[in-house]
């Protein structure tokens, strides 16, 4: 029986890795081993940062809400407590958007939160 080499399989595997490595710099794009190493690292970063993104946005929303609350003579924690007591169920993403783009509506929500305290 004849010996089977990995020519076609190897070429396909290399092409797949090099295709995913497009956009990398220098040898990390052209050389298979470096491309494979960088690709593994890149996938780890992507996995980690998909989770970190959620935390980062939540922190950003809280900073924006806090800044708008301070303009309405409230702290962030008292504002959130007032919302819970008033039964207003808006998430932080929506509240941050209102704080940035519609300050009049946010001021009304802040007043409702103050009354509930």
Swiss-Prot record:
A Pfam family hit: Ribosomal_L20
> Which of UniProt's keywords are assigned here?
Ribonucleoprotein, Ribosomal protein, RNA-binding, rRNA-binding
Among the GO molecular function terms of this UniProt record, one is: rRNA binding
Q: Entry's InterPro entries?
A: Ribosomal_bL20 (IPR005813), RIBOSOMAL_L20_CS (IPR049946), Ribosomal_protein_bL20_C (IPR035566)
Q: Which GO terms describe its biological process?
A: ribosomal large subunit assembly; translation
Which residues constitute the signal peptide according to the record? none
Instruction: Report the function annotation for this chain.
Output: Binds directly to 23S ribosomal RNA and is necessary for the in vitro assembly process of the 50S ribosomal subunit. It is not involved in the protein synthesizing functions of that subunit.
Write the protein's name: Large ribosomal subunit protein bL20
Q: Which organism is it from?
A: Campylobacter jejuni subsp. jejuni serotype O:6 (strain 81116 / NCTC 11828)
């Amino acid at each position: 029986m004849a010996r089977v080499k990995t020519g076609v399989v190897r070429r396909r595997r290399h092409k797949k890795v090099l295709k995913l490595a497009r956009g990398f710099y220098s040898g990390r794009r052209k050389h298979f081993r470096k491309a494979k190493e960088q690709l593994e690292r890149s996938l780890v970063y992507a996995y980690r940062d998909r989770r970190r993104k959620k935390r980062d946005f939540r922190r950003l929303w809280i900073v924006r809400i806090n800044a708008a609350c301070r303009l309405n003579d409230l702290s962030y924690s008292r504002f959130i407590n007032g919302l819970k007591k008033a039964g207003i169920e808006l998430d932080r993403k929506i509240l941050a958007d209102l704080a940035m783009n519609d300050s009049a509506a946010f001021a009304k929500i802040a007043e409702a939160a103050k009354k509930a305290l």
